[in-house]
């Protein structure tokens, strides 16, 4: 993992077309601004993990009944 230090207002580039800017730092939280093409999906990791967990629980609760054909 690459770890960088940035101050408010400073930007880093990911590839040629994604800009990540530190917008603010307050009470231990960092606010980030992200400029990226519309086809780049940006999601918070905790939401992805929550959705994956819910999908796994739903899949486990499904019961498939196999019926023999006569």
UniProtKB/Swiss-Prot annotation:
Sorted alphabetically, which InterPro entries does this protein's record hold?
A: CsrA (IPR003751), CsrA_sf (IPR036107)
GO cellular component terms, semicolon-separated: cytosol
* Keyword Cytoplasm on entry: yes
Carries keyword Repressor? Answer: yes
| TM regions (residue ranges) | none
Complexes and interactors: Homodimer; the beta-strands of each monomer intercalate to form a hydrophobic core, while the alpha-helices form wings that extend away from the core.
Q: Which HAMAP family match?
A: CsrA (MF_00167)
According to UniProt, the name of this protein is Translational regulator CsrA
Organism, by scientific name, is Hydrogenovibrio crunogenus (strain DSM 25203 / XCL-2) (Thiomicrospira crunogena)
């Amino acid at each position: 993992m690459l770890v960088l230090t940035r101050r408010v207002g400073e930007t880093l580039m990911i590839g040629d077309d994604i800009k990540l800017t530190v917008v603010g730092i307050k009470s231990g939280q960092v606010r980030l601004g992200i400029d990226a093409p519309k086809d780049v999906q940006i999601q918070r990791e905790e939401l992805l993990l929550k959705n994956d967990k819910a999908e796994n629980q739903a899949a486990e609760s499904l019961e498939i009944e196999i019926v023999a054909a006569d």
